[in-house]
Amino acid sequence: MKNIILASASERRQELLKRILEDFQIIVSDFDESSIPFKDNIPSYVMNLAEGKARSVGKKIMDQDSNLVIGCDTLVAFNNKVLGKPKDKKDAFEMLQALSGNEHEVYSGLAILDVKSNKIITDFVCTKVKFSKLTSLQIEKYINTGDPMDKAGAYGIQGKAGVFVENINGCYYNVVGLPLNKLNSMLMEMGVNL
């Protein structure tokens, strides 16, 4: 069996991967996300970011055999504008206010790199999420929990912001940060059967 490495510091991704895989390593990527400019194609952008993360970790372990590195990047898009992690509370408020009462998309790019052969596969998942109308007080109370500050789009569906979600169309785990169904099919393509 190949050693599987998750190129992510995200606790959410680690928890999700543990649901389908008992044994894996974590090596945090030092990939500079700003090195890839956004050019209006969100699926391509998230796949390039995921590949950059996987290759960054792959370079660190080139001398080891039988390693597969999983890279992932998740972002929120609204009106074809990328909403990353908020810079501050004001930014978080503006993001949540924009999402209030509207539908947005959550994209995750996935990349799996076979370090020995240098073979890489990439794919993406898009999930549509509709928020109910939020009051300013709801948004402020949520921001004051600190929860939105490390999350794309300034919310985590698996936490207190779950009550904001009116409906979801697509993979729930994608919105959390790691689309398990797509990851499973990609691992199978790389010869790993869970």
Curated annotation (Swiss-Prot):
Key words, A-Z: Cytoplasm, Hydrolase, Nucleotide metabolism
InterPro entries membership: ITPase-like_fam, Maf-like
E.C. numbers: 3.6.1.9
Residue positions of the active site: D73
Subcellular location: Cytoplasm
GO biological process: nucleotide metabolic process
GO MF annotation terms: dTTP diphosphatase activity; UTP diphosphatase activity
Cofactor(s) this protein cannot do without: a divalent metal cation
A Pfam family: Maf
Main localisation: cytoplasm
Domain of life: Bacteria
CDD domains: Maf (cd00555)
Catalytic activity: dTTP + H2O = dTMP + diphosphate + H(+); UTP + H2O = UMP + diphosphate + H(+)
Tagged with keyword ATP-binding: no
CC terms in the record's Gene Ontology section: cytoplasm
Site feature (Important for substrate specificity) residues: R12, T74, Q158
Record-linked PANTHER family: BIFUNCTIONAL DTTP/UTP PYROPHOSPHATASE/METHYLTRANSFERASE PROTEIN-RELATED (PTHR43213), BIFUNCTIONAL DTTP_UTP PYROPHOSPHATASE_METHYLTRANSFERASE PROTEIN-RELATED (PTHR43213:SF5)
Family: Belongs to the Maf family. YhdE subfamily.
NCBIfam families xref list: maf, PRK00078.1
Protein role: Nucleoside triphosphate pyrophosphatase that hydrolyzes dTTP and UTP. May have a dual role in cell division arrest and in preventing the incorporation of modified nucleotides into cellular nucleic acids.
Protein name (record): dTTP/UTP pyrophosphatase
